[in-house]
Amino acid sequence: MMMSVVAVMAWGCSTDHDSDDRYDASIRLSELPDTAREFIAKYYPGAKISHVGRKGTVTTTAYDVEFTDGAEVEFDATGLWTDVSAPRGKAIPTGIVLPAIDQYVSGYYPGAAINEIERIIPSGYEVDLTNRLELIFTQDGTFLSSYD
């Protein structure tokens, strides 16, 4: 009996290591970098969080926060967002995207909204719209290309 309790406790542990030294761990919101917690407080006030995790390898760390409505935010080791996504067909919170990108999207795609934005280091941003079109922008928000 004691052996099965220990096995269940070990199986239920929140850290998972795999063969290439990657790990995934559930963590508390308070364990996120300050910058990430401030981002969540600013853009997702009152939102219910379903999961907070830390992932990476021995040399890199990243964090992810999942909300009960299906939204998700990924952060780098310093707490800077790297990917922000809303549930399918919904828009991410306003204010996250550079004004130049917002203006481009509203000017050229007035019926669409930004569903996801990914920071592409070092070149810029990939933006997915609710109409399923994907746009690429430079770091300063200059439009580069689109594809679907």
Feature roles, as predicted:
Residues T61-P87, D128-D148:
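Amphipathic N-proximal alpha-helical interface segments
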Residues V84, P99-S106, E116-E118, P122-Y125, ...:
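Flexible "stalk/tail and boundary" regions
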